[in-house]
Amino acid sequence: TDCPVGGALFDGFSKGVLGLIPCAAQLVETDQGLVLIDTGYGVQDVKRPHPRLSKFFRVMLNIRFRMRETALRQIEALGYSARDVRHIVLTHLDFDHAGGIEDFPDARVHVMEKEREAAERKRRGFIARRRYRPAQWDDVRDWRTYANGGEPWFGFDSVRDLDGLPPEILMVPLPGHTWGHAGVAIESEGRWVLNAGDA
């Protein structure tokens, strides 16, 4: 959980000096296994925040690291294991959305192609060097990246299916917060929900 000084300026509702910004992950059950939308901070981030995360963001966001809040521990509390998570769909590769990737080593990781390219660029600016933390995802063995393009959907121009996932889970490009930022649309019981990441 991020608790930045600034309260309501950051989260829109806090009454005190500190804001409250949870690093949310979403778990979806499918016939192909569990699908995790973003991961939040991971076990290693909690154990060793330095050097995994930049001092700039650790201080600015006043991060409260709690092992019980990691996606892995919450999934285990539901009676599942890391191996049950077959897919991770990322809205983007910022440290607070991708930190738990390595907690699920057997999962296929889905992300927009432009996002992966931006995260791996050698000459990045001040913020990019601090937001993208390769140590969080450099051991991923199964990446699936997606170029812009696809089908129209509810006013969006280029929504697309994801390899190995049912058509009830879609990637929706939403560039802006990062070059390859995306939303993830999920259909459940005839209704669509859009996880807009940080858009």
Task: Tell where the protein language model's regions lie, with residue ranges.
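Structural motif
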Residues: G33-V35, H87, R191-N195
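Cap/insert and terminal regions of metallo-dependent hydrolase folds
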Residues: V43, R58-R73, G183-A199
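Active-site metal-binding motif and surrounding structural segment of the metallo-beta-lactamase
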Residues: H50-V111
